[in-house]
Design a protein with these regions (language model features):
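Donor nucleotide-activated moiety binding/catalytic core segment of transferases
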Residues: 199-255, 259
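Conserved catalytic-core segment of nucleotide-activated headgroup transferases in glycan assembly
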Residues: 138-204
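Carbohydrate-associated surface elements
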Residues: 133
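Short active-site oxyanion
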Residues: 102-107, 190-191, 236-239
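Active-site and donor-binding regions of nucleotide-sugar-utilizing enzymes
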Residues: 3, 7-8, 12-129, 138
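Catalytic binding pocket for nucleotide-activated donors in carbohydrate/polymer assembly enzymes
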Residues: 247-330
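Short His-Asn-centered micro-motif
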Residues: 108-111, 160-162, 193-198, 218-219, ...
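C-terminal non-catalytic accessory extensions
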Residues: 102-106, 113, 118, 319-337
Length: 337
């Protein structure tokens, strides 16, 4: 067993690992809280790098504020969830090593499809679908500030660009995507582009601003207000759009926002060993026939520009993302206490 898997399998070692990271970065929480007071569109301040500082002893739960959001929702007082939550939607039969090795008994995911894939591999855990995680995140803005922002933006198109993984860069035909965005731009007062924190660079900023687009980022992957910002931004939008499938589709559909996927070839490049590892996993997943079938079903469902979600789109999203599996505060409490 590798050192990493040894840590995953021991609650005490996971706890110690977290404590060491907290001692190394004593100002982490203060910095995250400071960023939580920034304007939603202050993407440069929100998307600055953060160190790898863990408070959730199940490491996946530190990503995007998933563990923090569940604890806020359920009123759990301790500093971690006693369950492992898949940090995003994985298409196909792939199951992370941490899910197989974790010390915890409960695994949480989106819907029945993922539940079945996990249970086919992990025999000694209980798997519970809880629907789109964004439901459990608190809003970034209160009602008054939200109303002010919506008035300022007017009718809004929100576009999610396909993003890189850890240690990777991502590229696609930006000119072609902008052409498709502009083909429906007349229907909106504001166009907002959502960029992952590590994909922001002067070249892309200049190009998007030249088109008159606003730039938004949900923040760093370890910023526990990530989902809160994303939730508020999606709620501010009237239409959503992307150039690939992904977890954003679960969140947009759950928040009842129409979505259009402009399918593009997405190219990734490894920047370091972490990137090489992630690309190897992505390549393995892409060869999975089930992965291909699941992605294709979603691409087909969202291939056309529609001004509202169709019944077929809702059905497909419920199938994969568990829209009907939203849990009460009491239910979440019992799963993560």
């Amino acid at each position: 067993m590798s050192i990493t898997n040894t840590i995953y399998s021991s609650k005490m070692l996971c706890w110690l690992y977290c404590k060491v990271s907290q001692l190394r970065y004593l100002g982490f929480k203060q910095e995250v809280e400071r960023r939580s007071r920034l304007d939603l569109f202050d993407y440069k301040g929100i998307a600055k790098p953060l160190p790898k500082c863990y408070f959730e002893i199940n490491t996946d739960n530190n990503c995007f504020g998933i563990g923090w959001s569940l604890r806020q929702y359920a009123g759990v007082k301790k500093s971690y969830c006693n369950a492992l939550v898949e940090h995003g939607y994985f298409f196909g039969t792939y199951v992370q090593e941490v899910e197989k090795k974790t010390f915890t008994k409960n695994l949480l995911t989106f819907g029945d499809v993922r539940k079945a894939h996990i249970e086919a591999v992990v025999k000694d855990k209980d798997v519970y679908p809880i629907g789109p995680y964004i439901h459990y995140a608190p809003d970034y803005y209160d009602e008054e500030r939200f109303a002010e922002e919506k008035k300022r933006l007017g009718r809004t198109l929100l576009v999610f660009f396909s993003h890189s993984g850890t240690g990777e860069s991502v590229s696609f035909d930006l000119d072609a995507l902008i052409e498709r965005i502009n083909s429906i731009r007349k229907d909106f007062q504001t166009v907002v582009i959502s960029l992952f924190w590590s994909d922001i660079n002067p070249e892309i900023e200049k190009r998007l601003k030249a088109e008159g687009y606003l730039i938004f980022s949900s923040g760093h992957r370890y910023d526990y207000y990530f989902l809160s910002r994303q939730k508020t931004m999606i709620k501010l939008a009237d239409m959503t759009m992307s150039n690939s499938t992904g977890t954003h589709l679960a969140y947009c559909s759950y928040l009842n926002k129409p979505h259009w996927i402009v399918r593009q070839e997405i190219k990734t490049k490894a920047l370091n060993k972490a990137g090489e590892g992630n690309m190897a996993i992505s390549e393995m997943m892409s060869k999975d026939v089930v992965n291909q079938q699941e992605n294709e079903e979603l691409y087909q469902a969202f291939a056309e520009y529609e001004e509202s979600l169709t019944n077929e789109q809702k059905r497909v999203c419920d199938k994969y993302f568990g829209l009907s599996y939203i849990r009460t505060k009491e239910e979440i409490f019992s799963l993560i206490k």
